[in-house]
Amino acid sequence: PSNGIFILLTSKLNLLLNTIISRCQIIRFRSFSGKQVNSILKDYLDTSKFNINKKLKIQDLINSANGSPSLLLKNIEIWNELSDEITNKLDSPIKNSLEILEVSKLISEQLEIDQQICLVNLIQIIWWRKTKNVYLLKTLEKLKSYLRKNIQPRLSWEITFLKISMENI
């Protein structure tokens, strides 16, 4: 059509061909700052409905959203759907092998893959706040990679938690 508009969205402009870029009107979008997301959260949401306890702070959720209010809502929803069995054990890295197997089973049975990846993000933030251990973050990043590649979720969680438990954290 002569009056048609084609909208092309990308997070990696440098990967597009110059011939494509030259024909586009570039509009750069930026994420909201943590303060802006916090303001949105306070102004538009009833925080009393959140199942947030000592393990997960509002600031952890804001950090996990990376400036996206919709991702913040998704993370809150996923956190609220988690059973207490899971949240109670994810306060810090698990050391007991039996608990690792139990939690891995619960996570893989109760959550879809995208929810599991979101949970990994939240775990990273909680554990980073408590331990400041880079190894933990790298190991959990590998877990996200395994989950995205559709490697058996339960096995992925078990291997990751067991690796972490063998480290002196």
Show the residue positions of the predicted features:
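Charged, glycine-rich active-site and insertion segments that engage polyanionic ligands
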Residues: S2-I5, K12-L122, I126-I169
